[in-house]
Swiss-Prot record:
Gene3D superfamilies, A to Z: Spore Coat Polysaccharide Biosynthesis Protein SpsA, Chain A
Subcellular location: Cytoplasm
Listed name of the protein: 3-deoxy-manno-octulosonate cytidylyltransferase
Entry EC number(s): 2.7.7.38
Gene that this polypeptide is encoded by: kdsB
Enzyme kind, highest EC tier: transferase
Record NCBIfam families: kdsB, PRK05450.1-3, PRK05450.1-5, PRK13368.1
Family: Belongs to the KdsB family.
PANTHER family: 3-DEOXY-MANNO-OCTULOSONATE CYTIDYLYLTRANSFERASE, 3-DEOXY-MANNO-OCTULOSONATE CYTIDYLYLTRANSFERASE, MITOCHONDRIAL
Main location: cytoplasm
Task of the protein: Activates KDO (a required 8-carbon sugar) for incorporation into bacterial lipopolysaccharide in Gram-negative bacteria.
Catalysed reaction equations from the record: 3-deoxy-alpha-D-manno-oct-2-ulosonate + CTP = CMP-3-deoxy-beta-D-manno-octulosonate + diphosphate
Length: 264
């Protein structure tokens, strides 16, 4: 896939300074440069019209300007990255069907092809207002893990539901495997959600008016707010699970080790 086949799109990297599990993780050193700089540089490779770092803290602003990034300062009271994204879209006056990609600031090795496939998926589905990514689950253990978010889709590859629960359910198969180990059956349609989001600017403009849904509150999954409102979410399929991001200091050490082996 080449960038010539892509529609125009913008990338915003929400970069919150405070993190409950790993404070200041975006400024942590990874192979001689901050985690955030890795993310910014991979975003540049995607061929977007613009790449913007959105932050609420002057230390991140200073660091980002230092490595040549475009920065927009945002409020510090946002509940999530989508709210920060919506503020940037309004400030930049992006409107209508303009496509905006949310690339998380703690994903230094996100494959660029996932950005491309999700942008193309949204562009091709004119009824969808946002898109995301999923890949196949093959391990039974992952299927039953509540930290692995699952998604089921309709025949147009639009999301029907996201859940921490195992779905869809193999009524007969799981009854015969009480240990919940091993591999899922070949062809079993279990999909793991990957947290990359692509929006039309028109959806971001009305995001603040969308109330939190009961489903979102129970599952702790922000994307359920959109499904609850009847918003169509297109799901692009990835060939495999990308390298894990930086959620904890242990994650960072793993990436440092992999980088030292040149295995990323």
């Amino acid at each position: 896939m080449t960038t010539q086949s892509l529609p125009d799109f913008h990338i915003v990297i929400p970069a919150r300074y405070a993190s409950q599990r790993f404070p200041q993780k975006l400024m942590a050193d990874l192979g001689g440069k901050p985690v955030l700089q890795w993310v910014y540089e991979l975003a540049l490779k995607a061929g977007a019209q613009s790449v913007t770092i959105a932050t609420d803290h002057q230390l991140i602003e200073k660091a980002a300007i230092g490595f040549g990034a475009s920065v927009v300062m945002t409020r510090d009271d946002h509940e999530n990255g989508t709210e920060r994204l919506a503020e940037v879209a309004a400030k930049m006056d992006w409107q209508g069907d303009e496509i905006v990609v949310n690339v998380q600031g703690d994903e230094p090795f996100l494959p660029v092809n996932l950005i491309h496939s999700s942008v193309i998926a949204l562009n091709q589905d004119k009824e969808a207002e946002m898109a995301t990514v999923a890949c196949a689950i093959d391990q039974v253990e992952d299927f039953f893990n509540p930290n692995v978010v699952k998604v089921v889709c309709d025949e147009k590859q639009r999301a029907l539901y996201f859940s921490r629960s195992p779905m869809p359910w193999d009524r007969d198969g799981f009854a015969s495997n009480p240990d919940r180990t091993g591999l899922l059956p070949v062809g079993f349609p279990a999909l793991r959600h990957i947290g990359l989001y692509v929006y039309r600017a028109s959806l971001l403009a009305k995001y603040a008016d969308l109330p939190m849904s009961p489903l979102e509150r129970w599952e702790k999954l922000e994307q359920l707010r959109f499904l609850h409102q009847g918003i169509k979410v297109q799901v692009a399929l990835a060939d495999g699970l990308p390298t894990h991001g930086v959620d904890t200091p242990e994650d960072l050490e793993k990436l440092r080790y992999q980088l030292s082996l040149d295995s990323i």
